[in-house]
Amino acid sequence: METIIEEYLKFIQIEKGLSENTIGAYRRDLKKYQLYMQEQKIAHIDFIDRQTIQECLGSLIDQGASAKSIARFISTIRSFHQFALREKYAAKDPTVLIETPKYEKKLPDVLDVEEVIQLLETPDLTKNNGYRDRTILELLYATGMRVTELIQIEIDDVNLIMGFVKVFGKGNKERIIPLGDTVIEYLDTYINNVRSQLLKKTVTNVLFLNLHGRPLTRQGIWKLIKQYGLRANINKTLTPHTLRHSFATHLLENGADLRAVQEMLGHSDISTTQLYTHVSKTQIRQMYNQFHPRA
């Protein structure tokens, strides 16, 4: 089964263009699956049946796996077995009758407009890394892009004259996101004045660099967002996705079209975008309860 797993991982990396993080998650799930089957002395993929899979899922639940984790695990092994059947590594797909559990999607943490401004104004613009950080925060809030998309942006992906940035999302899908006047100003100064001072002797087209002239990492962005959140005294859990959540929620609160927001966020399924309308409804309910005399 190990050989089939490796072939499957190669397939989804090449054919689907998934990120290393996503591939890593698939690999971990499949290694758990393989280990369980080894413990059950199952030597061949065709010996796996529905009951064995259900027992495997039961084992994960006993270990404390959440409904969301179980749903992802089922999705992974279902895709794996479909691949094995299609490529004739297996004669059947035992996941056909396995149901995916429903789980409640957690509403994301969102900053209000005042908190966003507090966060954006925290970096020290007199320092190169401070100006870079302000540009990063402005860009994340102005576009709603993922941090994994931001760290891949190259100089040529930014068109300041036309006012857009090109990013490559999940599955390496390209999309164009418009830029507002404020973020264009920050990008202009960063690209033409600040970046060259960070670049040093490094040769790279990547837009955002660290103090050593190397491309910033996802972990580096995570760290700076957490640090600025603490300095801004924001008492909410800040993650690299917080500004993305805030971008979507603020647009929808101000009447933006759901489909347009879906396009900018790069969501393949509009139900994911609709989650942000639930955030807005929650805030409306809180406001009603606070201010209506008969609430």
Swiss-Prot record:
Residues 106-289 form the Tyr recombinase domain. Gene3D superfamilies: 1.10.150.130, Intergrase catalytic core (1.10.443.10). The keyword Protein biosynthesis does not apply. GO terms for cellular component: cytoplasm. Residues 1-85 form the Core-binding (CB) domain. The active site is at residues 146, 170, 241, 244, 267, 276. It is found in: Cytoplasm. It comes from the Bacteria. SUPFAM superfamilies: DNA breaking-rejoining enzymes. Keywords: Cell cycle, Cell division, Chromosome partition, Cytoplasm, DNA integration, DNA recombination, DNA-binding. One of its GO terms (biological process) is DNA transposition. InterPro entries: CB, DNA_brk_join_enz, Integrase-like_cat_sf, Integrase_catalytic, Integrase_recombinase_N, Integrase_SAM-like_N, Recomb_XerD, Tyrosine_recombinase_XerC/XerD. It holds the Pfam family Phage_int_SAM_1. Belongs to the 'phage' integrase family. XerD subfamily. Site-specific tyrosine recombinase, which acts by catalyzing the cutting and rejoining of the recombining DNA molecules. The XerC-XerD complex is essential to convert dimers of the bacterial chromosome into monomers to permit their segregation at cell division. It also contributes to the segregational stability of plasmids. Forms a cyclic heterotetrameric complex composed of two molecules of XerC and two molecules of XerD. This is Tyrosine recombinase XerD. It comes from Staphylococcus haemolyticus (strain JCSC1435). The gene is xerD.
